[in-house]
Regions:
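Short alpha-helices
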Residues: 1-19
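Short gly/pro-enriched beta-turn/loop segments at secondary-structure junctions
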Residues: 7, 37-40, 47-50, 70-73, ...
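Terminal peptide-recognition signature
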Residues: 10, 45, 68, 85, ...
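Internal, active-site/partner-interface "lid" segment
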Residues: 16-46
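Bateman (tandem CBS) regulatory domains
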Residues: 38-52, 109-122
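The conserved cystathionine-beta-synthase
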Residues: 54-73, 79, 100, 123-146, ...
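Short beta->alpha transition motifs characteristic of CBS
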Residues: 73, 86-103, 156-172
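C-terminal non-catalytic interaction/assembly regions of soluble proteins
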Residues: 107, 111, 135-136
Length: 172
């Protein structure tokens, strides 16, 4: 452990002398703790779409509750029935709680996903660095973000990244 501490100290001195940033260090030492944290991509941590069932704009409140309860991400993604995997909305457990609070219980039987979903949620791509996704979640003070849909270049839903996964990976 003493040798490791001396090695770390020498690495820090070398970084400062060379004017290297943490990112430069991470690129040169991807297997180290710092390197791993700074080079992880969203694709390394996201839950892929083939593990998540889509719902549709006309899905009932009962279907939304069932899917959010069945899954392990606290949300469900919404798409058009006629389109491939184009994301048109997202319903989180928070959206669900707000809907139950704001709508008259008599309306619950007729509520559909389109009425409670977040239209145009903030999305990311799988090639984004995970640390950048975390920064995006943290900087949104207006409405806390605990998960981000992941899309490809064709705007198709390919997965979801949870704050929980980022924290488990040591990004906090």
């Amino acid at each position: 452990t003493v040798a490791m501490a001396i090695g770390d100290a020498l690495a820090v001195v070398w970084m400062e002398k060379r004017g290297l940033s943490k990112k430069d260090f991470a690129i040169n030492h991807p297997a180290g703790t710092l390197g791993r944290k700074l080079t992880l991509k969203v694709s390394d941590l996201m839950k892929p779409s083939n593990q998540l069932n889509p719902l549709f704009k006309d899905s009932s409140l009962r279907e939304v509750i069932s899917e959010i309860t069945r899954g392990s991400i606290g949300s469900c993604w919404i798409k058009e029935r006629s389109q491939d995997n184009k994301l048109i909305g997202l319903i989180t457990d928070g959206d669900l709680r707000r809907a139950l609070k704001n709508y008259d219980p008599k309306k619950w039987e007729t509520l559909v996903a389109e009425e409670i979903m977040t239209n145009d949620p903030i999305v990311i791509t799988s090639d984004l660095f995970a640390i950048e996704a975390l920064e995006l979640m943290e900087k949104n003070k207006k409405k806390p973000i605990s998960l981000l849909p992941v899309i490809d270049k064709d705007n198709e839903f390919i997965g979801i990244l949870r704050l929980h996964d980022l924290i488990q990976a040591g990004l906090n």
